[in-house]
Each structure stands twice: as C-alpha cells, then as structure tokens.
C-alpha cells in the first residue's frame, strides 16, 4: 500500500468522503475483477512489445460514464478495436496486443479543484467514480457509493468483453460483419472491406489445408485486456490481492490487467508511484513535454528495479508541435542507460484545443502528425515504436475535427457526448489505424534494408 506520508496531489483536494472505511472494507472482500495469471500473461505480451515482436493497441473512452454504460456501446467499442487490430496486424506482420481503456476508466485528474460558470464556483467533475457531471451543488459532492457502482459496472463490462473475445465475435471469418452501419460507404470502410477480402482469401486457403476456426482457436478467439489510470488509490488498494497460487507470489492490482500513472501524478514522491512500485502487473507511465530525462530514469529504476521486459511501458504524450524535440532526449537517455521499457504514442492528450464554439476538440491533422513524429524519432534512434494509445469510441460522435469523413467545428454540437475529453469516432479510428499500419510497414521495410546493409 502507498505510504501515508507520501504526497498525493490529486487525492488531497477535498475528496476525503470518497474513502470512507466501510466502502473500502466492502470492496476489499469482493471478488477480484481480473486474476494474477491474466496480468502475468499480459506482462509477457508486453515484453514482446518492448522487443519489437508485437505491437500494442490501447484504446477506449477518455472517461467511462454510468449513463453510457450499456451492452451496445461496449460491443461497438470492442468491434472497432478488433477492426483496428486487423488493420495493424496486416500492416506490421506482428501480433497486436489489444488493451481497452475500459472496465474501470471512471476517474480523471483535473488541473483545477473548482469549476466556475457564470460566477458560480463548484468542485470540478472528477469522473463518475467520484461525483456527477451536472453543474449542481449536490451532484458535485463526492459520493462514496460510486466506488461500488464502478466495481459493479466494471464487472459487467469485463464479463461481456470476455464473452465477445471468446464467444465468436472475434472469429476472423466474420471480418465483414464488424463494420458499423454509420461507417459504411466511407473511404475507410471501403479500404477495410478490401483488406477483409484479402484476409478471407487467405483463410479459405488455410481452410483447404485443414486449419479452420473449429480446430484452430486463434481464428475464432482473441486475447483482450483492460486498463485504466490508477488514480483513486483507495479503490485500487481495496482491490489489491496477494497471489497465493503460483510460486511467483506477489501483490497484484485486480481492478484491471494494466494500470498507468498519469502525467499529473508521476512525481517520484507521489503516492501513485509508491503504489505502482508494489504491484506485479504490467504498468504504464505517461510522459509529457515537461518530463526531464534524469527524472524519467529515476522513475524507471524505481518502478522496474529488476529491469524486466514487459513490466513498464512509457506512454509519450507530447503534442504534435513538440513530439520530435521533447521525445528524442527521453529516448536517448533511456537507450544510453540500458533500461528496458516499451514505448507507446498517445497522440490525444497533447493536442486538445478549444474550438470557437467553446467545445474542447482535437484535430485529426495534429493527432496524425504526432503519430508520424513518434515513428520518425524511433526510426532515427533505431528503437522500437511499440504501440499507440487512443481515446476513441464505437459511437458516431462528433468530438474530434477533421478526417476524410470530415467533422468540422460547426458539426461539434451535433453529437458531442463525451464526459471529459473529445474522442475519435469509428471512422476516424479506422483512418488512424490505416496510417499506423502504413508507418509500421515502412518501418518493417527500413529494418529489412538495414539488415541487408549490415550483412
């Protein structure tokens, strides 16, 4: 558990009521949401990501909400992630590790403890795990019962995701059925349909050779993992369990397979770092433009003292204008140190702007520019661009502007449903997947040329 004396900037801002002891006790006796062996398996998969043997796709809601928690939304997000993974697999010729920002992403750090509208000041909305989005006194009061609601909704989401992953929805013979209705007819849907036809032809050949979904599990099932920011530590600690089954005994967070530390809570004296240091799950660390290379090395050594591949993934969120200038010194320092990490690109959080209409939005051009910059730096440094981390949804929202099926600022109000930051819709998500696939294919070609040149 996190030491009491360690500074915890995000949790000390008037949220004491959230952590009432009876709620913690109730959570501590509830069954784990995930199991140690699942987290251990993901750690092995993340080792492959760090070594360039697999590629990470991490995506889902900025902040899940109780209002949007239903089977259709979960299914549609899962389906878009499956489509993106197929596109990335085709481009990279690598296994794609699929991790959702799902089943627990109900809290958000805020830069200000208060929100002011028309001279009225109320506590900031911190996600449905803490309080309600409605701008009213009672709604903004922290409510400890919400922790139990998050547990229940996360459990039902995980149950559904496991059913989807192993119950036939991931069957590769159903590739053509994954397209969402509102995506049909777009350029991305046409490109996806062409790719699906190529894969179907390959499957027909494999079927003729005796490999079918009935006798080959990999053709009908997929591994799917969950993750969220480990922000509210009393929730995380109450769901931390000791693994007593295997020889590799240790403490595991059982609220998700993977947790990450946000850019606002990554100071080395934060309670969040102390908590993450003590769990055996694979973990992520967000790195923003203010990240100092020496501080980063100290954090890596604290979070991964045994220097194990798969333990720690650095999630870079620099902004399109700064990605090359800010990311290169970090990669240089880590490479020189010999420390083993995975590298992942979050092109969302550094590119949030306010539209003239007042809506927060993100521009597809900026998002794509940061992804390109991420790959450019890694190609130059001969390091591994290990993954991408998107905020997206399977819903037909209008929250990010741009893309081939263009959403402009005038459209933002049409279907702006996010409870926090703007998300990519399914069409925009597929467009980005095709971009990343092209970059991965180019990276593969460059690597092959280097190997030939050396030999």
Give residue ranges: language-model regions:
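Short, small-residue-biased leader/transition segments that mark boundaries at the very start
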Residues: 2-19
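Structural motif
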Residues: 1, 10, 274-275, 380
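N-terminal "leader" segments that precede or initiate the main folded domain
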Residues: 20-75
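General beta-strand structural signal in soluble alpha/beta enzymes
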Residues: 57-59, 97-99, 343-345, 390
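Amphipathic coiled-coil/heptad-repeat helices and related helical stalk/stem segments
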Residues: 2, 268-269, 323, 327
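Active-site-facing alpha/beta catalytic cores
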Residues: 64, 68-319, 362, 370, ...
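Non-transmembrane, aqueous-exposed alpha-helical and coiled segments at domain scale
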Residues: 296-305, 311-343, 349-398
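Ligand/cofactor-recognition surfaces for anionic moieties
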Residues: 51, 286, 455
């Amino acid at each position: 558990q996190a030491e009491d004396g360690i500074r915890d900037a995000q949790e000390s801002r008037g949220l004491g009521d959230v952590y009432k002891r009876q709620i913690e006790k109730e959570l501590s006796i509830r069954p784990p949401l995930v199991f140690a062996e699942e987290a251990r398996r993901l750690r092995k998969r993340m080792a492959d990501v760090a070594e360039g043997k697999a590629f990470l796709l991490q995506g889902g809601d900025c902040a899940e909400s109780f209002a949007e928690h239903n089977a259709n939304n979960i299914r549609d997000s899962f389906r878009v992630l499956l489509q993106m993974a197929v596109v990335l697999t085709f481009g990279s010729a690598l296994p794609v590790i699929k991790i959702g920002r799902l089943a627990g992403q109900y809290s958000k750090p805020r830069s200000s403890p208060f929100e002011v509208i028309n001279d009225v000041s109320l506590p900031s909305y911190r996600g449905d795990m803490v309080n309600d989005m409605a701008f009213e006194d009672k709604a903004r009061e922290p409510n400890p019962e919400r922790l139990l609601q998050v547990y229940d909704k996360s459990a039902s989401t995980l149950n559904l995701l496991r059913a989807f992953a192993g119950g036939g929805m991931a069957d590769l013979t159903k590739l053509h059925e994954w397209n969402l209705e509102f995506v049909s007819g777009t350029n991305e849907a046409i490109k996806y349909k062409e790719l699906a036809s190529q894969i179907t032809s390959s499957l027909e050949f494999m079927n003729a050779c005796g490999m079918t979904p009935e006798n080959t599990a990999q053709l009908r099932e997929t591994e799917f993992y969950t993750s969220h920011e480990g922000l509210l530590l009393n929730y995380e600690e109450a769901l931390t369990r000791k693994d007593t089954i295997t020889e590799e005994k240790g403490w595991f967070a059982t609220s998700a397979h993977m947790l990450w530390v946000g850019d606002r809570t990554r100071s080395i004296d934060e309670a969040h770092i102390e908590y993450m240091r003590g769990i055996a799950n694979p973990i992520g660390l967000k790195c923003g433009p203010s990240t100092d290379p020496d501080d980063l090395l100290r954090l890596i050594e604290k979070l991964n003292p045994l220097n194990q591949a798969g333990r720690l993934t650095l999630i870079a969120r620099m902004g399109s204008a700064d990605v090359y200038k800010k990311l290169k010194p970090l990669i240089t320092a880590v490479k020189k140190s010999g420390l083993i990490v995975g590298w992942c690109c979050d092109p969302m959080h550094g590119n949030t702007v306010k539209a003239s209409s007042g809506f927060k939005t993100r521009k597809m051009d900026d998002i794509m520019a940061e992804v390109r910059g991420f790959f450019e730096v890694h190609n130059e440094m001969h390091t591994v661009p290990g993954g991408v981390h998107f905020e997206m949804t399977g819903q037909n929202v209008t929250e990010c502007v741009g893309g081939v099926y263009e959403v402009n600022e005038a459209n933002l109000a049409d279907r702006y449903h996010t409870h926090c930051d703007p998300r990519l819709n399914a069409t925009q998500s597929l467009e980005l997947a095709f971009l990343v696939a092209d970059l991965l294919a180019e990276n593969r070609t460059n690597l092959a040329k280097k190997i030939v040149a050396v030999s």
